[in-house]
Amino acid sequence: MASNNVAQFATELKMPADVLLTQLRDAGVEKSSTSDELSKADKDKLLEHLRRAHGVAPDGEKKKITLMRKETTEIKQADATGKSRTIQVEVRKKRTFVKRDEPAAEEAPVVVAAPIIDAAEVERRAEESRRHAELMARQEADLREKQERLAKLEAEKETQAKALKKAEVDAQKAEVDAQKAEAEKPVEVKADESAIEEKKRVAAEESKKKAAAAAKEAAKEANEKAAATELARKVVADEVAQIKAMMNAPRRAIKAPEPVAPVAKPAAEGTLHKPADKKPGEKKDEKKPAVTADKKSIKSANVSSTWQDDAKKRSAGIKTRGNTGGGRDGWRAGTKGRRQSHHDDRESNFQAPTEAVVKDVQVPETITVAELAHKMSVKASEVIKQLMKLGQMCTINQVLDQETAMILVEEMGHVAHAAKLDDPEALLEIGAEQADVEALPRAPVVTVMGHVDHGKTSLLDYIRRAKVATGEAGGITQHIGAYHVETPRGMITFLDTPGHEAFTAMRARGAKATDIVILVVAADDGVMPQTKEAIAHAKAAGVPLVVAINKIDKPSANLDRVKQELIAEQVVPEEYGGDSPFVPVSAKTGEGIDALLEQVLLQAEVLELKAPVVSPARGLVVEAKLDKGRGPVATILVQSGTLRRGDVVLAGSAYGRVRAMLDENGKSISEAGPSIPVEIQGLTEVPNAGEEVMVMADERKAREIGLFRQGKFRDVKLAKQQAAKLENMFENMGEGEVKNLPMIIKTDVQGSQEALVGSLQKLSTGEVRVQVVHAAVGGISESDVNLAVASKAVIIGFNTRADASARKLAEANGVDIRYYNIIYDAVDEIKAAMSGMLSPEKREQALGLVEIRQVILVSKVGAIAGCYVLEGVVKRGASVRLLRDNVVIWTGELDSLKRFKDDAKEVKFGFECGLTLKNFNDIKEGDQLEVFEVQEIARTL
């Protein structure tokens, strides 16, 4: 039926009538009451106004489009137990494209306009002009530099020409003067003048000769320097080439020694091994001529001969260091009490040194020192010695972690590769890759998450009661955390994980056990902190969300508020353009339950979930426990394949044959396919929640892998602890032992949390650091106390309180919980606590000065000093410095202090006393003792 008035139109649009009246008035349609009639023109006017307000073109064509892109990556991080966890990181990118308006069809008469240059062309031309300007500037600078150089050369030439012209003028003038004087003076004076001229000419020639000699000497010196540099370079190059040739030369066969030709080149200075100039049979009676060289002389071409000649020198009678056996080499003549052998192995079995062999060492996760030495073909003592050089004391049977072993291999000159060659688990992956089985559709695995007070348990109970047969309803056991429900459109498997322990463990191991998450939110309560935590878990796992807004039957239910709060947490409903369906349900009346299951199945169809059926089963441990009568019991969710009774399964380090299989109703079953939860018995131990379960071909292989995992886990744990101790030691040494004050902060609102965290982190110094382990909004829960126990942190509650269970747990574990209402009180108390963690400042306070006037030596006591107190006071146990000629000789403590024969606590100025120094007797008369004490002063921030 077409709507004729405002009220009917509002009902059709599912919105309040007063809001519709406001929008009509904004659009220019004057309607005063809900009974006013609406025409089609009024509705078109309202629609055009709303489109204009939301940025949509009037003709209905979209002017902009928004694209969202998600990228999921994985990073690995070690947890507190040392196990490696995979954390998924999702990056979202959003880009909006706006369509520009097309130019109008009707325009003014066509006018030939100048060609339009786009921005890229303008930028290119600007860049070209800038380059041209830079080129012109460089050319101008080069031209200016050349002109300056030419001007300088011309100025120098002009100066030389002027000097030459001046010298010629002076010479001519002197000659004219000399002629005049010669005409005026008698003959003997002319003779004197000629002698003076001769002297001047000789002096000028000598100065020219000296200048030429100096220039020649400078040129000669420069040539000598260049020649010396070139000679040194050639010497180094020759030495390098000779050493390389010697190292790469093949080992020679044993043959009779041939006479060595004399080497004409001078011996190298400063070398220990010098080549022999004589033949081996000749005596060395004549002394060698002394060879002196200002520069480094060139070594012999045959460098290896210098090593061979050592034995010949010793056989000729030349004794070297430690060689007391008449030319025998070695540090000792022979073993104790035995005659010395005349056989020299080095003379006959000499081999040229070969190049070091670099090995590729495969390093597993853990390896002992002995195994690592065997892989590198070296002695274990060499490996232990290298470890000691690296600062780690170890034994031959000590287990090293992979990182330490790889560093050690690199230090010893080999190439290390991380490998798992001895890991029997490699066969599991190979077998899984080879299996090619057809995948069939499977049921979705759904995890129900949300706040405990939002009706999650009631919703699950209603689903059980509605979808499980009446006869089977009483057989449901409450401790099983997984069950499946049959619907007309298919089966759904629900996963109930209280506290989300299994969900977190599965996500950490990179296994995607959950396909869809149902987020339960109460309509009257809204989004709570645990709801935010559930949203974060679901986003980190990368699974779609289906939001169930519960308790819609309550009068205080407000769906719009819940939607707005969820939008603030980046959970956008489909009706607003998001990807999360919102379903209002009531666990009390059952309203909306079918629609919720329908949405879950729709999401499963979109995901196209498939798994192989005819193959060995694989799955995950949902939860496990130790039953008194049945032993280890594990609830397993089969992910692929079919699990049958009697199969040999492996779950982590636990293994065994499936002796019994029960479904969620407690009934015995013989097999279970994909997405079916079952409870199995027969394992050797209780596996961890989230461990991967797989069916093995035989029990022997399962036992081998299980025992290997047990040993590897133990070895890795021990190796990690050892490495952590060493790293912490070096880190503390490097940082000066920085102390940490770990904290967990819980506040009432987000603003208080940010302000408190910022204020406390500003208190960090170089010695004490505030470490905020966790900060969140809400009350203090048991999980916060458990985190505080693990991290040894202090819990600060700002306008929040801990619940009864959290208080009980904190009291049992000794966790300190502090409550504050004023932020400055919290900052002041934390500041005081950090001040108490600061190491006290030590200051010396001088007490007195003592002069030693007599020294008495007593056999059993040592040196006793008879002293006179010059200044201050002397106290027993005080620290002293011994001054000799005003130079500090020793610093220590007083051992005893006496006045006459009685022990004295202190001796004041002007009195005499006797004293002894602790572990020091080198005292003389006239020495002075400076007495002081060290005081510790508390520091503040």
From Swiss-Prot:
<feature type="compositionally biased region" description="Basic and acidic residues">
    <location>
        <begin position="170"/>
        <end position="209"/>
    </location>
</feature>
<dbReference type="InterPro" id="IPR044145">
    <property type="entry name" value="IF2_II"/>
</dbReference>
<dbReference type="InterPro" id="IPR000178">
    <property type="entry name" value="TF_IF2_bacterial-like"/>
</dbReference>
<feature type="binding site">
    <location>
        <begin position="496"/>
        <end position="500"/>
    </location>
    <ligand>
        <name>GTP</name>
    </ligand>
</feature>
<feature type="region of interest" description="G5">
    <location>
        <begin position="586"/>
        <end position="588"/>
    </location>
</feature>
<keyword id="KW-0547">Nucleotide-binding</keyword>
<dbReference type="Pfam" id="PF08364">
    <property type="entry name" value="IF2_assoc"/>
</dbReference>
<feature type="region of interest" description="Disordered">
    <location>
        <begin position="170"/>
        <end position="228"/>
    </location>
</feature>
<dbReference type="Pfam" id="PF03144">
    <property type="entry name" value="GTP_EFTU_D2"/>
</dbReference>
<feature type="region of interest" description="G2">
    <location>
        <begin position="475"/>
        <end position="479"/>
    </location>
</feature>
<keyword id="KW-0342">GTP-binding</keyword>
<dbReference type="InterPro" id="IPR000795">
    <property type="entry name" value="T_Tr_GTP-bd_dom"/>
</dbReference>
<feature type="region of interest" description="G1">
    <location>
        <begin position="450"/>
        <end position="457"/>
    </location>
</feature>
<dbReference type="InterPro" id="IPR013575">
    <property type="entry name" value="IF2_assoc_dom_bac"/>
</dbReference>
<dbReference type="InterPro" id="IPR006847">
    <property type="entry name" value="IF2_N"/>
</dbReference>
<dbReference type="GO" id="GO:0005525">
    <property type="term" value="F:GTP binding"/>
</dbReference>
<dbReference type="InterPro" id="IPR009000">
    <property type="entry name" value="Transl_B-barrel_sf"/>
</dbReference>
<feature type="region of interest" description="G4">
    <location>
        <begin position="550"/>
        <end position="553"/>
    </location>
</feature>
<dbReference type="InterPro" id="IPR036925">
    <property type="entry name" value="TIF_IF2_dom3_sf"/>
</dbReference>
<dbReference type="GO" id="GO:0005829">
    <property type="term" value="C:cytosol"/>
</dbReference>
<comment type="function">
    <text>One of the essential components for the initiation of protein synthesis. Protects formylmethionyl-tRNA from spontaneous hydrolysis and promotes its binding to the 30S ribosomal subunits. Also involved in the hydrolysis of GTP during the formation of the 70S ribosomal complex.</text>
</comment>
<dbReference type="Pfam" id="PF11987">
    <property type="entry name" value="IF-2"/>
</dbReference>
<dbReference type="InterPro" id="IPR027417">
    <property type="entry name" value="P-loop_NTPase"/>
</dbReference>
<feature type="binding site">
    <location>
        <begin position="450"/>
        <end position="457"/>
    </location>
    <ligand>
        <name>GTP</name>
    </ligand>
</feature>
<dbReference type="GO" id="GO:0097216">
    <property type="term" value="F:guanosine tetraphosphate binding"/>
</dbReference>
<dbReference type="InterPro" id="IPR015760">
    <property type="entry name" value="TIF_IF2"/>
</dbReference>
<dbReference type="InterPro" id="IPR005225">
    <property type="entry name" value="Small_GTP-bd"/>
</dbReference>
<keyword id="KW-0963">Cytoplasm</keyword>
<feature type="compositionally biased region" description="Polar residues">
    <location>
        <begin position="299"/>
        <end position="308"/>
    </location>
</feature>
<dbReference type="Pfam" id="PF22042">
    <property type="entry name" value="EF-G_D2"/>
</dbReference>
<feature type="region of interest" description="Disordered">
    <location>
        <begin position="252"/>
        <end position="351"/>
    </location>
</feature>
<keyword id="KW-0648">Protein biosynthesis</keyword>
<dbReference type="InterPro" id="IPR053905">
    <property type="entry name" value="EF-G-like_DII"/>
</dbReference>
<dbReference type="InterPro" id="IPR023115">
    <property type="entry name" value="TIF_IF2_dom3"/>
</dbReference>
<feature type="compositionally biased region" description="Low complexity">
    <location>
        <begin position="256"/>
        <end position="269"/>
    </location>
</feature>
<dbReference type="Pfam" id="PF04760">
    <property type="entry name" value="IF2_N"/>
</dbReference>
<dbReference type="Pfam" id="PF00009">
    <property type="entry name" value="GTP_EFTU"/>
</dbReference>
<feature type="compositionally biased region" description="Basic and acidic residues">
    <location>
        <begin position="271"/>
        <end position="297"/>
    </location>
</feature>
<dbReference type="GO" id="GO:0003743">
    <property type="term" value="F:translation initiation factor activity"/>
</dbReference>
<protein>
    <recommendedName>
        <fullName>Translation initiation factor IF-2</fullName>
    </recommendedName>
</protein>
<feature type="region of interest" description="G3">
    <location>
        <begin position="496"/>
        <end position="499"/>
    </location>
</feature>
<comment type="similarity">
    <text>Belongs to the TRAFAC class translation factor GTPase superfamily. Classic translation factor GTPase family. IF-2 subfamily.</text>
</comment>
